[in-house]
Amino acid sequence: MSEQIINLLITGTLDTLQMTIVSTIMAMLLGIPLGVILVVTSKGHILENVALNKVLGAIVNATRSVPFIILMVAIIPFTRMVAGTSIGTTAACVPLTIAAIPFLARLVETSIKDINFGVIEAAQSMGASPLQIIWKVLLPEALPTIIDNVTVLIVNLISYSAMAGAIGGGGLGDIAIRYGYQRFQADIMIATIIILVILVQLVQMIGDAWSKAMNKK
């Protein structure tokens, strides 16, 4: 494998990491709060608001139901408005983030719903406000599983970023399609697959270790 190809793979890996990291950060900033809101506004919870809960739930379900490749194409005008372009790694971060937010929100919602409601009632009996319950009870109790959720999200975003290469998103997916598929260079196709597998394994190992460490605390 020539030095040019190695440099190409390094650039593609860095582009994939950029798309994944940016999208993960944005998804955490918006998806985790959305997941919390979906829980606390549900019927019988600390900030019950059934109407808001149903609206947010419908939006989340609608977004999650659209396959990623279709979502990328459908929001090209919005991507161009936000990123100034519809191709490249920066542009790919927009649909990746939009796909990631509802995905993480549902995972976080499930994690928080698994918390024993007796813990919440105990905090309420001691006079804790809804905000205090969220920050000091719900999030700490659900933290290990939220870390697992973020790990699952990152693994999905790595695969989504590879799909983004199909329509000019850059990264390893773009390299695999342009060189491995269109030019029949099997060595490059295999190399991109190996790199993607290594990235996923590393993310899973780190996420599992972090979750176990937080669980012990």
Language-model features: where?
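C-terminal transmembrane helix and the adjacent membrane-cytosol boundary/short C-terminal tail
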Residues: 37-43, 125, 189-217
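Short helix-to-coil transition segments within interhelical loops
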Residues: 112-142, 182
